[in-house]
Amino acid sequence: GFLYKDNIYFSHYATAWQIFKDYPVAGVGLKNFRAYCSDPAYLDKVYPGYRNINCTTHPHNLYYEILSELGILGAIIFFSFFVYFFYICLKRSYEQSNMFLYGNTLFLMTYFIPFLPRGSFFTNWNAIIFWTIFTISFYLLNKKETHA
């Protein structure tokens, strides 16, 4: 359809998928998508209309970024950590009636909505926002209640 052929992000997704297929276990390393996407081998593997726009600093999608740069092993560790973190945060926010922790957790979870184009998870202003709120949530999760 028109969304696939006219959307520049699909060129990045296709390239990231090809990189993942070539390096499925451990990926190419954090922030190395930019080094591999310009390889001529990937130009031949993507949709012909994307051959001149397939390379950028990151794939613009969290899942493709993690798979291409960290591979299956890294993706399992990465996503397991966040699933566990979100579970603990939601559980504690319910037990303590902490709406601030609950809201922060829901906000952080929106970063994991599939198929949304995003900046790099590790290196841009989106990352600054995510990691700042993550740190606040982590603090709230470990904060000891003080009684006056």
Put a short name on every predicted segment.
Residues E69-F112:
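Hydrophobic transmembrane alpha-helices and their immediate junctions
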Residues F2-A14, A26-L70:
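Long extracytoplasmic/lumenal interhelical loops at the membrane interface
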Residues N104-A148:
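Transmembrane alpha-helices of multi-pass inner-membrane enzymes
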Residues T15, Y36, L62, I66-I72, ...:
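Generic recognition of well-ordered alpha-helical segments
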Residues L30-N32, G74-I77, F122:
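Short, flexible micro-motifs
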